[in-house]
């Protein structure tokens, strides 16, 4: 196959989206954008990106940020382990590299939360290093370009595709080339529907287009079934119209975040909830059921039943706090599961 870079780059320079982390591709900006975009669409992430940078304009500011403020800045993006790793890495960068990301792929790859793709994106876009940055968009483009039925979630297949990506990469324009492939996958060679082949600068080279197999590619491994977990959520309100929050453990799902009272296991009856509240020193003055709901994590599905409970005046149990509506809005970070 002839080299795809000339046609790809010509298309990219004419059609790329104007994004703040492209306008100013400093290492910190590229890093932050890539972490945010791991599980979030560009249009949804941009307001968070701008708000985050306004509050934490550089790596030392990120490293020094208080945990609750950090979580609040991330609130709405989900997958909070991303921002915790972001801060862990920022602290290492301050300790070992003077607050500036290292211009070295392996050093970037060694930082918490930075994998092959993110390290490659920072190294190529911000530092001009000739390294790959292969994400799902790029794998899809190359799966169709070569009409390759390999399962792209398998490590050996990904390595083979990465080698092909590098065969076409112009070393002097590595960052632009990597971004162009991502952009092509995001805008033209799209998933979950018909690719826009008539708009593709690589259409004349695409083997899947010639074979009529573009809609069938790429192949992925079947997803693992999510584990179903019943939980009971209790919105406990006191006489001062404050709500009881408990902090989740420092490790595991939603680590360190705040939530209403929650019990895992089979759905509890109203009587069982009142008994448990009384064991915490809370008198159940009135109780009303809440609509059933569910929340899907990457590997777990919560089936949520719940109650709204008035408990009168009481001290917060150990590990809990009373929070006003204003504090819920401005101080405490609640996961999206509890915002229905």
List each language-model region with its residue ranges.
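Catalytic cores of DNA base-excision repair glycosylases
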Residues: 2-198, 202-211, 215, 283
């Amino acid at each position: 196959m002839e080299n795809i870079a000339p046609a790809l780059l010509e298309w990219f320079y004419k059609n790329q989206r104007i994004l703040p982390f492209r306008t100013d591709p400093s290492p910190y900006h590229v890093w932050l954008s890539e972490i945010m975009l791991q599980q979030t669409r560009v249009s949804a992430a941009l307001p968070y990106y701008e708000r985050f940078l306004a509050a934490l304009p550089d790596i030392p500011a990120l490293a020094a940020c208080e945990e609750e403020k950090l979580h609040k800045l991330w609130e709405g993006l989900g997958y909070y382990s991303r921002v915790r790793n972001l801060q862990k890495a920022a602290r290492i960068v301050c300790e070992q590299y003077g607050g500036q990301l290292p211009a070295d792929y392996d050093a970037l790859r060694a930082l918490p939360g930075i994998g092959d793709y993110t390290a490659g994106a920072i190294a190529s876009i911000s530092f001009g290093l000739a390294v790959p940055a292969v994400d799902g968009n790029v794998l899809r483009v190359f799966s169709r370009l070569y009409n390759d039925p390999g399962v792209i979630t398998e490590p050996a297949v990904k390595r083979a595709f990465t080698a092909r990506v590098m065969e076409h990469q112009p070393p002097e324009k590595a960052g632009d080339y990597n971004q162009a492939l991502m952009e092509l996958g995001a805008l033209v060679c799209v998933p979950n529907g018909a690719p826009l082949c008539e708009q593709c600068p690589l259409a004349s080279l695409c083997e899947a287009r010639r074979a009529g197999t573009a809609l069938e590619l790429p192949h992925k491994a079947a997803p693992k079934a999510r584990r179903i977990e019943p939980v009971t959520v209790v919105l406990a309100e006191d006489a001062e119209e404050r709500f009881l929050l408990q902090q989740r453990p420092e490790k595991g799902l939603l680590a360190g975040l705040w939530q209403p009272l929650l019990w895992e296991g089979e759905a509890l009856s109203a009587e069982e909830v009142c008994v448990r509240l009384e064991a915490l020193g809370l008198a159940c003055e009135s109780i009303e059921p809440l609509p059933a709901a569910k929340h899907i994590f990457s590997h777990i599905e919560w089936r949520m039943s719940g109650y709204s409970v008035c408990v009168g005046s009481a001290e917060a149990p150990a590990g809990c706090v009373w929070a006003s509506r204003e504090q819920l809005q401005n101080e405490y970070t609640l996961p999206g599961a509890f915002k229905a």
